[in-house]
Amino acid sequence: MKAVVRVLKLEERAVHRQQNRPPAVQGSQHQSHSPACMNPALMSSPWVRQKHGGRAIPNRLCLSTTDSPHSYRYQDDDSPPPEHSFPRLTNEVRAPELVHVSEKNLSEIENVHGYVSHSHISPLKASPAPIIVNTDTLESVPYVNGTEIEYEFEEITLERGNSGLGFSIAGGTDNPHIGDDPGIFITKIIPGGAAAEDGRLRVNDCILRVNESDVSEVSHSKAVEALKAAGSIVRLYVRRRRPMLETVTEIKLIKGPKGLGFSIAGGVGNQHIPGDNSIYVTKIIDGGAAQKDGRLQVGDRLLMVNNYTLEEVTHEEAVAILKNTSDVVYLKVGKPTSVYLSDPYGPPDITHSFSPAMENHISSPGNNGTLEYKSSLPPISPGRYSPLPKHLLGEEDINRNPSLDEMEGHRFDSQHFQLREPRKIVLHKGSTGLGFNIVGGEDGEGIFVSFILAGGPADLSGELRRGDQILSVNGIDLRGATHEQAAAALKGAGQTVTIIAQYRPEEYGRFEAKIHDLREQMMNHSMSSGSGSLRTNQKRSLYVRALFDYERAKDSGLPSQGLSFRYGDILHVINASDDEWWQARRVTPEGDSEEMGVIPSKRRVERKERARLKTVKFNAKPGSLDSKGSFSEKRRKNFIFSRKFPFYKNKDADEQDGSDSERSQEELILSYEPVIRQEINYARPVIILGPMKDRINDDLISEFPDKFGSCVPPANSSDQEDTTRPKRDYEVDGRDYHFMASREQMEKDIQEHKFIEAGQYNDNLYGTSVQSVKYVAERGKHCILDVSGNAIKRLQVAQLYPIAIFIKPRSIESLMEMNKRLTEEQAKKTYDRAMKLEQEFGEYFTALVQGDTLEDIYNQCKMVIEEQSGPYIWIPSKEKL
């Protein structure tokens, strides 16, 4: 019956989705243009192809994760019987045709994926060379701030692969993608697909015709139908903006008191020029490094910063790259040439491009040390490409500290702020301390401010800046102090701190130049006021798996550019010689990534987490139990049969599971796990833990029976394979269970670690043996295991390294949203159980998965399994950190 219900669900899901595509929301020009449901790499996988009528149907229909009234929602385990939950189909329904349609609430994006071994020009009609056509010949001439846009046209012939054409589209008359343009635009080229193999189609190309079908002014759905009906050989006639003529030059800037001194706009999802994701210079700040150098101009396109490309990055990523530079910055810049000859908003004289600096009235600092700005805003002449107000374009000044004079309109008037003279600053400590870092204190060179934490007391006051020398703290003279003495003075200064500071950029510059070499060698020391020791050990390199999420923007103590990562990421630690900071690169399937940065060491992570846990325990309510300890104790006391069989208790098993009792005594801090790369020749078992795991397991086996299997046939209600229970008349040995000859034999096998999990029910033993898992794995199927987290380690010991996925709920509310029948109390219990699972087995998980819908979670699980399938995988090593 269970298998029949599953088939019904799949058929019902296909029909329901085909008939109930959510309509696009009209009228919004601020859209999200990324495919909504699945990673492109996964969509091109054979796993995502359903079988229908004996033939492969390319792509699986997938809906948005939004709460559209037409969105399909999986049934949860406690939902009503299937006959009461099918949607009412009032219209006549044709046989379901599964296609991939990815929709979001504000825009529709069609993924047309595919992979072909070659792409060629149709012999019927050769692709002509690109034709340059001036838009004067069009009925409606597009303009960008008075400049006519020139287009070129190209015909591209693609051969459809097994899964489609290999690109994503957005737009249409019902939901324009760029401004009011009704065109159908290319939003993504899928790596390995037909379009990528051909190499001519580009992001932002506008499709005018598909074979003989005109799609220049049609709805999104009509364009999708035209692409679907185009056959195996597809001719696309596309329009693209003529590339801007520009010369590329390199500019070296040296930061001064006002940082780099320019503003930027643009980026992916925040285009400064419609259809262009580039980063543009929009303002040159008076007195900044860019103005003094004289070569950078408004309208220049930033191509690279040092070794980091700014092509196809978001605005935030570009800002982060520019902010995290040292004092010497190399820019690769594209400068416009003849395209601006008729542009009335061509490059202005930078000395006249903006009105004089707005007047800043700085009031006396209040109790919180903040400054009050009252600005008079004179009219600003339009920039070269500014069809939208600047506050909608994400324009941002790039300077040394975004909270001080670098932010537009917050420049300091020298009449009010005599930086070169010693000055008194009063700060009040907040949750982040004083909000700045210090360096120096060696050989009497002085103590300098090296970093201002955004949003901290120092930042909010606006009075302290990088390059300030700290002369005294609450009357304690620090002019000749060591780093340790200065840190102690700041720590012990109380809530209200009076600082005498003097801006000395030249002295600080010399000091920073000296420590630059140390940074290059990774001899970093913590620049927070809490520590300043500099320890150098022998250089050490290793690979680790991250067991926590790390966001560099949230770490105020970073000594240099940090490297963000997520749980499960593999990191190549290039240098682990320092006790506080390691230098690392993220490892991708293609090898080490180019991005390199600093990450906190294992010692630093664990020290900070212990300090946090002490605070949490101190603030806990009286009578509350340590969740980890209580959970472990509960598992030890309640030894009953369940879907998660607690491991059979015996002397050896107790020794093996000793970590459970140890964890109840001492909190386990997760930081990094040393790993090595290994080649495997089997399909890795899959263990999914957390809410909705049963639905995910069932769907994987139902959708991909050739890829996934279980230790027993799916029609059997039990997920365990071996038992000491006598065989019943209707049961078959080896099909329903492996019936053991005697209890003594099974107990012996358990003691010899031949079972990954075992339990007792009605005086009979049940369990899943290592051999049964290996049998499935060696036949090329991922063995789906419904076991507890303890089985992960036991499989590793047996050298069957599982893919262990933890479904981590976002919140109690999200659980109730995914399962409408859950009460708040039930959702809370489910959430608490999930958190305890993470606490107890977090170090063994391959990946954490989160999503707003079951469909989203399911797709992420498939993606993780595909990425982790091998043949090369990372496994725990015995190296000590």
Curated annotation (Swiss-Prot):
Claim: Membrane is one of the keywords in the record: yes
InterPro entries: DLG1-4_PDZ_assoc (IPR019583), DLG1-like (IPR016313), DLG1_PEST_dom (IPR019590), DLG2_SH3 (IPR035759), GK/Ca_channel_bsu (IPR008145), Guanylate_kin-like_dom (IPR008144), Guanylate_kinase_CS (IPR020590), P-loop_NTPase (IPR027417)
GO biological process: cell-cell adhesion; chemical synaptic transmission; establishment or maintenance of epithelial cell apical/basal polarity; nervous system development; protein localization to synapse; receptor clustering; receptor localization to synapse; regulation of postsynaptic membrane neurotransmitter receptor levels
Domain PDZ: 155-242, 250-337, 424-505
Record key words, sorted: Cell membrane, Cell projection, Lipoprotein, Membrane, Repeat, SH3 domain, Synapse
Disulphide-bridged cysteine pairs: none
GO MF entry, a single one: ionotropic glutamate receptor binding
Compartmental location: Cell membrane; Postsynaptic density; Synapse; Membrane
Membrane-related topology note: Lipid-anchor
Pfam family, one: SH3_1
Transmembrane segments annotated in the record for this chain: none
Role according to the record: May play a role in synapse assembly and function.
Domain SH3 residue range list: 539-609
Name of the protein in question: Disks large homolog 2
Span of domain Guanylate kinase-like: 683-866
Family (UniProt): Belongs to the MAGUK family.
A cellular component term, taken from the record's GO annotations: postsynaptic density membrane
Organism name: Danio rerio
Region named Disordered: 16-41, 63-88, 709-729
Keyword Kinase found: no
